[in-house]
């Protein structure tokens, strides 16, 4: 998952003397990576993510589930520090559950996104968390919200995040079109994630997908031999 940890005020290791033989791992930035995505369609949303969790060059987990349920019809995609995003997701799930009980009705997707925004903004100096919130509610139907690091919130027709997203902005912008069906969104998401996993060394593993509609949540996992092989010849015409 995409994050960076560094010691504040750290100085570089000396070039000479006994200290030069000491590893400077405390001063190095430890990077991790991920690729997450969500797309809105008429009647619901599709979410997707890779499953690799890394710490620098070390792969800590090959089958991480980065699609986290927040409520019955609301999920989030997590990028950043795994510990930070898990803690934030747990806190929002807890608050949203109480909110739903008080109102005696399912929560709105916008409410869930606002809770993420408030927490990510309040603790922006301490958190490494980029979140995509997507789901369905009776008022607005399918919705996708992005809360990047820092706590800004914006609603979008689709959102991508994580270190792998840098490699697929062009593909996503060129390929996305309004009015896609659920199956088209699932294929679109799988293709985009496969492209990111091909280029980003911090993204990999399997592809996890979820489609959320009024009828419920459908989840699927694409294993290695099921991940799309996207080439120039397989791309749709412009």
Swiss-Prot record:
It is an enzyme of class 3 (hydrolase). Its main location: cytoplasm. The keyword Cytoplasm applies. The modification N-acetylalanine is found at residue 2. It catalyses: Cleavage of peptide bonds with very broad specificity. GO terms for biological process: proteasome-mediated ubiquitin-dependent protein catabolic process. Its EC number is 3.4.25.1. Keywords: Acetylation, Cytoplasm, Hydrolase, Nucleus, Phosphoprotein, Protease, Proteasome, Threonine protease, Zymogen. The active site is at 34 (nucleophile). The modification Phosphothreonine is found at residue 68. InterPro entries: Ntn_hydrolases_N, Pept_T1A_subB, Proteasome_bsu_CS, Proteasome_sua/b, Proteasome_suB-type. PROSITE patterns: PROTEASOME_BETA_1 (PS00854), PROTEASOME_BETA_2 (PS51476). Belongs to the peptidase T1B family. PANTHER family: METALLOPROTEASE TLDD, PROTEASOME SUBUNIT BETA. The 26S proteasome consists of a 20S proteasome core and two 19S regulatory subunits. The 20S proteasome core is a barrel-shaped complex made of 28 subunits that are arranged in four stacked rings. The two outer rings are each formed by seven alpha subunits, and the two inner rings are formed by seven beta subunits. The proteolytic activity is exerted by three beta-subunits PSMB5, PSMB6 and PSMB7. This is Proteasome subunit beta type-6.
């Amino acid at each position: 998952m995409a994050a960076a940890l560094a010691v504040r005020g750290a100085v570089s290791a000396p070039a000479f003397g006994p200290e030069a033989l000491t590893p400077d791992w405390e001063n190095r930035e430890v990077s991790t990576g991920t690729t997450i995505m969500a797309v809105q369609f008429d009647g619901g949303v599709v979410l997707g993510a890779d499953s690799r969790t890394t710490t620098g060059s070390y792969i800590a987990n090959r089958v991480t589930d980065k699609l986290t349920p927040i409520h019955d019809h609301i999920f989030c995609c997590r990028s950043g520090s795994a510990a930070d995003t898990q803690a934030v997701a747990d806190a929002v799930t807890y608050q949203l559950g109480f909110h739903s009980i008080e109102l005696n009705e399912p929560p709105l997707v916008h409410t869930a996104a606002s809770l993420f925004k408030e927490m990510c903004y309040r603790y922006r100096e301490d958190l490494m968390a980029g979140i995509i919130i997507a789901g369905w509610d009776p008022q607005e139907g399918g919705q996708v919200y992005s809360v990047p690091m820092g706590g800004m919130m914006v609603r979008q027709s689709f959102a991508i995040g994580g270190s792998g997203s840098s490699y697929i902005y062009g593909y996503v912008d060129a390929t996305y079109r309004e009015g896609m069906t659920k199956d088209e969104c699932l294929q679109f998401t799988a293709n985009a994630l496969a492209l990111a996993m091909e280029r980003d060394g911090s993204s990999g593993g399997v592809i996890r997908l979820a489609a959320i509609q009024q009828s419920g949540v459908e989840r699927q996992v694409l294993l290695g031999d099921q991940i799309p092989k996207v080439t120039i010849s397989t791309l749709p015409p412009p």
